[in-house]
UniProtKB/Swiss-Prot annotation:
Higher taxonomy: Eukaryota, Metazoa, Chordata, Craniata, Vertebrata
Encoding gene per record: litaf
Region (Disordered): 1-23
Residues given in the record as Zn(2+) binding sites: 98, 101, 150, 153
Protein name: Lipopolysaccharide-induced tumor necrosis factor-alpha factor homolog
Species per Swiss-Prot/TrEMBL record: Danio rerio (Zebrafish)
Function: Plays a role in endosomal protein trafficking and in targeting proteins for lysosomal degradation. May also contribute to the regulation of gene expression in the nucleus. Binds DNA (in vitro) and may play a synergistic role in the nucleus in regulating the expression of numerous cytokines.
Residue positions of motif PPxY motif: 22-25
InterPro entries: LITAF (IPR006629), LITAF_fam (IPR037519)
Subcellular location(s) per record: Cytoplasm; Nucleus; Lysosome membrane; Early endosome membrane
Entry-linked Pfam families: zf-LITAF-like
Length: 163
């Protein structure tokens, strides 16, 4: 004899214990108690009585201005700020706009010893290059920091730090 599987759906004729059976379609498709089933009044018939909301008068008058007083507006000083989008200062000269002399220039480079040069010197000294070889990083421009200057007024436009 085959046993019914526990995951099979229940049979149609069974009812749950303690629960009444659901209503039939005829019972629920009857008249809705919240809406009247009678005919609606004609649309051209006007409702009698007050409007549903109190009306409020709207006055578009502006407050009176004092005569004889001139209208003054504050003076605003405008300063133009030139932003150079995507300008990256590297180890080669770039075309930039100098905010001091207001010229479009190609930058002048100046190299200075930064942290990478000193760390390279210390690293070479640790490995035994004490007799002058540890000073080689001070001669290599690719290890130094780069400062970009304006060739006209010598103002600093940007700095490229190696480390």
């Amino acid at each position: 004899m085959a046993m019914p599987m526990p995951t099979a759906p229940p049979m149609e004729n069974t009812t749950l214990v303690g629960h009444p059976p659901p209503p039939s379609y005829d019972e629920i498709s009857g008249a809705n108690p919240y809406y009247p089933a009678g005919p609606y009044p004609p649309a051209d018939m006007k409702a009698s009585g007050p409007p549903p909301y109190p009306t409020q008068e709207y006055n578009q008058m502006y407050p009176p201005t004092a005569q004889g007083q001139p209208v003054t507006s504050p003076v605003v000083a405008v300063q133009t700020v030139y932003v150079q989008p995507g300008l990256v200062f590297g180890n080669v000269p770039v075309q930039a706009h100098c905010p001091v002399c207001s010229q479009s220039v190609i930058t002048r480079l100046e190299y200075s010893s930064g942290p990478l040069v000193w760390l390279s010197c210390a690293g070479l000294a640790v490995f035994g290059c004490i007799y002058g070889c540890c000073l080689i990083p001070f001669c290599i421009e690719d290890l130094k920091d780069v400062t970009h200057h304006c060739p006209n007024c010598s103002s600093v436009l940007g700095v490229h730090k190696r480390f």
